């Protein structure tokens, strides 16, 4: 891959992995809007770059929420000494919220086998539909709860909602934030818990892809992987910081509007044909 392609892919995946957007939608649209050397020959990023981007994004989220992570680690250590601690409770919630997605992935891997690549129309409809759902719920639902108020039922419901992200175009962070807002959690708290849930989710994805890398071996990709990891780290960190700052004073409106536009673009390409791509980039 060209250096510019690596940077563009890392930027897109780093940003869309943490924002309530659709990484699948962007990656589906990318080959049509950036014809290097032609829309039909956009290269596969490869396993090594996939691992690198996941690790870069994971590092960004872990760095931004280091206080929560320190509290969870310290709380678990104090719990081992017989002392109850809010940090240990938060760690329990993160583990509990992750279990539905883990169970779903294992069940699908065992019973369903490989899943066919989705079409543009599917990605477009899910990007658009779940974006509108986030907008409606964000506007209509209460804003009273914090993560400290979260019980096991709410946590499991948010975790179950994450399973919908297995549908391409849904966005894991987006659907988790939507579920949290539906349950009455503050915007910042919804984003915060979604980001904490993303740590085991991204780590798990990186581990699975890393196992593939260990089997096939791509050591020659080390310089490119380093560039991808650093780019994804910077993009994800800035994206998380900007989102959290925005949500302290505003709602999810800009993210909803962007998803509607992205979904509309994907649907236009799906139903009117890729011949529209030159008009979108001109």
From Swiss-Prot:
- InterPro entries documented for this protein: UppP
Named from the GO MF annotations, one term is: undecaprenyl-diphosphatase activity
Primary location: membrane
Protein's cellular compartments = Cell inner membrane
Q: Which reaction does it catalyse?
A: di-trans,octa-cis-undecaprenyl diphosphate + H2O = di-trans,octa-cis-undecaprenyl phosphate + phosphate + H(+)
From the UniProt annotation, give the residues forming the signal peptide. Answer: none
Into which EC class is this enzyme placed? hydrolase
- Identify the keywords attached in UniProt to this record, alphabetized: Antibiotic resistance, Cell inner membrane, Cell membrane, Cell shape, Cell wall biogenesis/degradation, Hydrolase, Membrane, Peptidoglycan synthesis, Transmembrane, Transmembrane helix
Q: Which residues cross the membrane?
A: 1-21, 46-66, 91-111, 117-137, 150-170, 193-213, 226-246, 260-280
A GO CC annotation given for this chain: plasma membrane
Enzyme Commission numbers on file: 3.6.1.27
The UniProt entry lists membrane topology as:
Multi-pass membrane protein
- A GO biological process held by the record: response to antibiotic
Q: What does this protein do?
A: Catalyzes the dephosphorylation of undecaprenyl diphosphate (UPP). Confers resistance to bacitracin.
Miscellaneous: Bacitracin is thought to be involved in the inhibition of peptidoglycan synthesis by sequestering undecaprenyl diphosphate, thereby reducing the pool of lipid carrier available.
The entry assigns this protein to a family as follows: Belongs to the UppP family.
Protein name, UniProt field: Undecaprenyl-diphosphatase 1
Annotated organism of origin: Rhodospirillum rubrum (strain ATCC 11170 / ATH 1.1.1 / DSM 467 / LMG 4362 / NCIMB 8255 / S1)
């Amino acid at each position: 891959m060209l250096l510019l392609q690596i940077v563009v892919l890392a930027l897109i995946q780093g940003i869309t992995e943490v924002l309530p957007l659709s990484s699948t939608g962007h990656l589906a649209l990318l080959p049509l809007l950036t014809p290097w050397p032609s829309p039909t020959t956009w290269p596969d990023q490869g396993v090594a770059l996939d691992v690198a981007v996941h690790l870069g994004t994971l590092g960004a989220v872990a760095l931004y929420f280091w206080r929560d992570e320190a509290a969870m680690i310290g709380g678990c250590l104090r719990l081992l000494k017989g002392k109850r601690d809010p940090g240990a409770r938060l760690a329990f919630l993160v583990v509990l919220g992750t279990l539905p997605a883990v169970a779903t992935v294992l069940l699908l891997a065992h019973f369903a086998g490989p899943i066919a690549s989705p079409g543009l129309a599917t990605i477009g409809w899910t990007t658009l539909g779940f974006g509108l759902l986030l907008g409606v719920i964000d506007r209509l639902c209460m804003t009273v709860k914090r993560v400290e108020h979260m019980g096991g039922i709410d946590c499991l419901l948010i975790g179950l909602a994450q399973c919908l992200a297995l549908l391409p175009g849904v966005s894991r962070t987006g659907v988790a934030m939507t579920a949290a807002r539906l349950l009455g959690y503050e915007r910042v708290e919804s984003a915060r818990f979604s980001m904490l849930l993303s740590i085991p989710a991204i780590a798990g994805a990186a581990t699975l892809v890393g196992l593939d890398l260990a089997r096939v071996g791509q050591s020659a990709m080390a310089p490119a992987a380093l560039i991808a990891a650093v780019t994804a780290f910077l993009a994800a960190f800035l994206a998380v910081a900007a989102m959290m700052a925005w949500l302290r004073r505003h709602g999810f409106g800009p993210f909803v509007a962007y998803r509607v536009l992205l979904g509309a673009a994907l649907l236009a390409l799906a139903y009117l044909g890729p011949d529209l791509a030159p008009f979108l980039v001109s």
